[in-house]
């Protein structure tokens, strides 16, 4: 049973409102850019559900939280779940990435971070099924810490408080779609291209009609939160 009986959301200090119109998305973007200290908002074509977080007492927006398609492949997560490539490609739509989460400081609500994560599991899981037709079985998130882990906002403390598991760290690379200028050339010119554009220096490849580059990125902690007791069986079916 959930920590919340969500039959009446207004019994609780916070509530969510999904971003469905441009004005809500604008507020979401502004909150992320203001309070999310190291990753700004960007639009990427993928599954995505964004929420504004309101304080119930005065209906004031105090934060933003969102889920999106999970990361294509990451070894520590895939090993934790037990995925091989084929199973991952088949079942990855049952995992969502808590890709952004921020709260305004001095919001006046104790433990608001863990409250928001619990509501995300309720609202996000229900909406994921309604919108995309897949059961949401697990959440993932990535936290880029300070070198000495001195700042709780940057070491994943709120996820640990909500009983997420820190399963490892990323390798410091990421995959993104390649600019047209990178893939319109022949493979034989890759050496010259790499010298001109660092984004092509690690690797580039194609999947169907889509072209990607593997680039360097900051190393991040990987946190996972199963949403179903049978998560391992469901994600490996």
Language-model features: locations:
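Generic secondary-structure transition motif, activating predominantly at the C-termini of alpha-helices
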Residues: 33-36, 227, 231
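Flexible, glycine-/basic-rich loop-and-beta segments that form/coincide
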Residues: 232-237
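Polar low-complexity intrinsically disordered regions
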Residues: 1-3, 32, 150
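Short, basic/aromatic recognition patches
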Residues: 25-49
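Conserved N-terminal entry element of GNAT/NAT acetyltransferase domains
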Residues: 1-22
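Generic signal for short, ordered secondary-structure residues
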Residues: 10-11, 32, 202
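Acyl-donor binding region in acyl/amide transferases
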Residues: 17-18, 22, 26-27, 47-49, ...
């Amino acid at each position: 049973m959930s920590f919340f009986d969500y039959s009446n959301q207004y019994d609780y200090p916070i509530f969510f409102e999904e971003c469905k119109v441009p004005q809500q998305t604008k507020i979401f973007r502004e909150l992320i850019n203001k309070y999310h200290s190291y990753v700004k908002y960007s639009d990427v074509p993928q599954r995505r559900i964004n929420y504004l977080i309101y304080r119930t007492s005065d209906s004031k927006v105090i934060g933003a939280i969102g889920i999106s398609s999970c990361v294509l492949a990451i070894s520590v997560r895939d090993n934790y779940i037990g995925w091989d490539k084929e199973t991952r490609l088949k079942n990855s739509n049952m995992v969502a990435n808590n890709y952004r989460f921020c709260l305004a400081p001095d919001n006046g609500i104790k433990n608001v971070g863990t409250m928001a994560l619990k509501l995300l599991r309720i609202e996000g899981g229900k909406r994921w099924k309604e919108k995309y037709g897949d059961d949401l079985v697990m959440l993932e998130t990535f936290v880029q810490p300070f070198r000495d882990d001195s700042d709780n906002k940057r070491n994943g403390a709120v996820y640990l408080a909500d009983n997420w598991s820190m399963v490892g760290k990323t390798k410091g690379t990421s995959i993104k779609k390649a600019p047209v200028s990178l893939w319109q050339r022949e493979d034989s010119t890759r050496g010259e291209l790499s010298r001109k554009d660092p984004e092509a220096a690690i690797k580039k490849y194609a999947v169907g009609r889509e072209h990607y580059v593997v680039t360097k990125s900051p190393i991040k902690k990987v946190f996972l939160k199963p949403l179903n007791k049978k998560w391992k069986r469901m994600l490996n079916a």
